Amino acid sequence: IGQARMLYQLVATLKGGAVTEDKLAYFRDTHEFRNYTLLELPHHGPLSGYASSSLDYGTTIVRNFLYSALMALLWEALEKSANADLAAIAAKSLKEVRYHLRHSRDWLVRLGDGTDESHARSQASLDHLFPYTQEFWAHSPAEAAAVEAGIGVDLNTLKADWDAIVDAALAEATLQRPAAGGYV
């Protein structure tokens, strides 16, 4: 929430006028909300038919790891933004997201290389969630404009490093990376 607040405050300052952090966060039309689908999925493993499930810590860990690996790279790249305020937010956010990455990676390894059950559940969660990461690399017009202005990052330039982080953790966790392909 702290990272989002800093970004909303920056945008409100840049827009000026009656625009406030709260207006940006809470008073937008539905189509103005943006988020990766991965982050909106329930915190349980894959289901089929009318099955129901309780929350699954492994699913939460897999999701946090995949997203934190991206955000660590993104904040690191944004430290070089031409917008000094955004660069400062990135520097502060990078410290926090590195902690999240370390925490989720450690737990991913514990669960993946743990008991047969924790391994199987972690692999099932990875198989279920991984295809949604393809959305990370879908280029948007807003991203292109930010890159052109020198304030943003082309996320596709981060993919090789993200792949390396993910592959190293999965190898240590004895988990298999799902086949390429996704839902984008």
Task: Name each region found by the language model.
Residues 81-91, 98, 110, 167-184:
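C-terminal intrinsically disordered extensions
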Residues 120-184:
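Extended, helix-rich structural scaffolds rather than catalytic motifs
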Residues 14-15, 74-92, 106-121, 139-150:
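Inter-helical turn/loop segments and adjacent helix faces that build the functional surface
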